[in-house]
C-alpha cells in the first residue's frame, strides 16, 4: 500500500483562522475556517489586535476539528505546514506558534509557506500544473504577476506600486456605505450598472507589467464628494460598474501583455479578488481572443479567500523540495517571493 503524504496546514495571516489536512498536495480531507468578519465590520476594516485575539481563541478548536473531519491523528501526519508571511505580525505569530508546537511535540517536519504561493496553489485543486506558467494574484494586500518557469520557482514580473486591487475595493465600498469586506457587493452592483463615469485606467498603456490603483480610488472619492456637494445622487450601480471596469481593464490588459512576452502553458487567477465574476469573465474572454493556447486555471471560489487548504497544497510542494524550518521560525510580515529566491 502506497503511503499517503498528509500535511496539517495552518493559515492565520490576517482575519481568518484556518486549519486543513491535505493528502498528496491536491486532495482536501478537511478545511476549517473560522471567520472574523462580524468583529471587524464596525471598524470598516481589520483591526490587528482584534484579529490576534480571535486567532488565539480559535486555533486549538480549528485544529481539533480539522483532524476529526479528516479522520486522522497526529501519528498519521507527514509534516506540518504554516504561513509565516506576508501578513499581520500578531496574526501570523499565532499560526506559527501553533505549528511549531505541534511539529515539536510530535517530531514532525515543519514546513514554512509563503502566503502568496499558497494562493497560487489553490488552483492545484482544479488541475495539475504545467510549466512554464503565469499567475495573476489579486487580493486585499497584493496585486502581482508571477512567472513560474518551473515548480517552486517564482519571479515577480509586475506588482502594484501603491494600493492593491482588493484594498481599493474595500475603500471604495466604504465610501458607498457597503460593509467590510466590500468586494462581493461591489461586484454584484457592477453587474447591474454601466461604465458611465469612465474612471482612469492608470498605467494601462505603459510598457511594463506594474499596476496602480491609488489614482482610481482618489478619482472615485472625488466624484462622490463633488456630487454630495451639489446635492446630486449618483446611481450606485453605475458607480460600482465604472470602478470595477477600470480595475478589470487594467488587470486583463497587463496580464495579456505579460503573456505576449512570457510564453506559458497555463495562467492562474488566484487571491481573494479572483472570486470577482467580472474579472473572471473578462480575463477568460481576453485569453480566448489573444492567447487561446493558454489554459486558464481559476482557483475554486471557496479557496479564493484565505484558507489553510491552499497552504497545505503549497506546503506539500515545499516539503518535496526539502524546505524545512526549526523552532527559530518567526513571522515575516513583509515576506516576498524575493525572500524565497534568497533562501533557496
Swiss-Prot record:
Keywords from the named record: Acyltransferase, Cytoplasm, Iron, Metal-binding, Transferase, tRNA processing
Keyword Nucleotide-binding: no
Binding site for substrate: 137-141, 170, 183, 187, 276
Annotated cofactor note: Binds 1 Fe(2+) ion per subunit.
Coiled coil: none
The keyword Cytoplasm belongs to this UniProt entry's keyword annotation: yes
InterPro entries attached to this UniProt entry: ATPase_NBD (IPR043129), Gcp-like_dom (IPR000905), KAE1/TsaD (IPR017861), Peptidase_M22_CS (IPR017860), TsaD (IPR022450)
SUPFAM superfamilies named in the record: Actin-like ATPase domain
Sequence similarity: Belongs to the KAE1 / TsaD family.
Protein name per the record: tRNA N6-adenosine threonylcarbamoyltransferase
Annotated organism of origin: Limosilactobacillus fermentum (strain NBRC 3956 / LMG 18251) (Lactobacillus fermentum)
Gene this protein is translated from: tsaD
